[in-house]
Design a protein with these regions (language model features):
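Conserved alpha-helix/loop element of class I SAM-dependent methyltransferases that forms part
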Residues: 3-19
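Conserved proline-anchored active-site loop of SAM-dependent methyltransferases
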Residues: 10-12, 23-37, 44-48, 119-126, ...
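Class I S-adenosyl-L-methionine-dependent methyltransferase module
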Residues: 40-168
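Mobile active-site "lid"/loop adjacent to the S-adenosyl-L-methionine
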Residues: 134, 138-146, 198-218
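Short, conserved active-site loop motifs that form the nucleotide-linked donor/cofactor pocket
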Residues: 166-167, 190, 258
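Short loop/edge segments at beta-strand edges and connector loops
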Residues: 170-172, 264
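Short amphipathic alpha-helix with an adjacent loop that forms part of the alpha/beta core around
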Residues: 178-187
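Long, positively charged, glycine-interspersed low-complexity recognition regions
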Residues: 199, 208-286
Length: 286
């Protein structure tokens, strides 16, 4: 969420068209972008069913109930109420206690998983992200963050967005989503935003070859198809990551005369090694 929030402050939404009727967030992730877009209808999609469970959490639960549950678990397990970065937090013994509390909570969640505990775990996991092993167990290590007032604001915004806006939630691969949406009579009113996994980065969501060159190629084909329908779209991506250039993306931009928008002073940061100095851009067909 952090990267997109920073880009929103740097004018990401301002680069979108005015008067959007249907906003399609193809790789919604935290859905922070969609929450900041004014549209008549929001289509929120992600292929990760765990993220879709969070959208449904915001849609179906009261904000007070969510926050109360999180605070209850913090008290029950003795989770940290402040950041515990080792070079800033002086009490090393406390850090170990908080880590043990997290591991206990994680083990209990894996025994009896539920969406409220899953969401609570994320606030204390490394980089506040999630990951599951082959057994379906949450296995993200303990991080140094905690549940904060900023997190409470995000929950309030999320609940308001999913409960009060006209939203339609999908849990599809991007290829299947576009195939389905382009059959709708209102497809010409749609604006598509893509924030795919970035080829060549090592973010948690892209471990174990989660995003392949074939996926990248298929995505480019879908973008071309939308352009053929005269449908506007925008895509966030990274062209250069620590010296590794995404030549596939550059060739696609050049071949189709897409526009590339940059954000002064913004560097893409991901949970993973080797992602420093990766400049994020916005690519559009308008």
């Amino acid at each position: 969420m952090g990267n997109k929030k920073k880009l929103i402050h740097k004018g990401l939404i301002d680069k979108f068209p005015d008067n959007i009727s249907v906003f399609v967030d193809v790789f919604a992730g935290s859905s922070i972008v969609g929450m900041n877009v004014n549209a008549d209808i929001h289509i929120v999609n992600d292929s990760d069913s765990n993220l879709v469970k969070l959208y449904e959490l915001f849609e179906n639960y009261d904000v007070t109930d969510i926050i109360n549950h999180i605070n209850s678990r913090i008290g029950e397990y003795g989770l940290a109420r402040e950041r515990t970065k080792r070079n800033e937090f002086k009490d090393k013994r406390k850090i170990d206690e908080y880590k043990s509390a997290y591991m206990k909570f994680r083990a209990d969640y894996n025994t009896n998983p539920n969406v409220l505990d899953f969401y609570t775990l994320m606030f204390y996991s490394f980089s506040q992200q999630f990951r599951f092993n082959n057994k379906g167990e949450f296995n993200m290590p303990c991080g140094n963050d905690c549940f904060s007032h900023k997190n409470e604001e995000y929950i309030k915004n999320g609940c308001e967005f999913f409960s009060k806006c006209t939203t339609k939630i999908y849990n599809n691969d991007f290829r299947e989503l576009l195939k389905e949406l382009l059959k709708m009579k209102c497809h010409e009113k749609m604006f598509f935003y893509f924030d795919p996994p970035y080829l060549g980065t090592t973010a948690t969501y892209n471990e174990n070859n989660g995003w392949s060159e074939q996926d990248e190629t298929d995505l480019y084909s879908e973008l071309e198809k939308l352009s053929e329908y005269n449908i506007k779209w925008a895509m966030s991506n990274v062209i250069n990551n620590k010296g590794r250039v995404n030549q596939m993306l550059i060739d696609q931009i050049d071949a189709n005369n897409y526009n590339v928008h940059t954000f002064d002073g913004f560097t893409y940061m991901a949970c993973g090694k080797g992602n420093s100095n990766a400049k994020e851009v916005l690519i559009t067909n308008y």
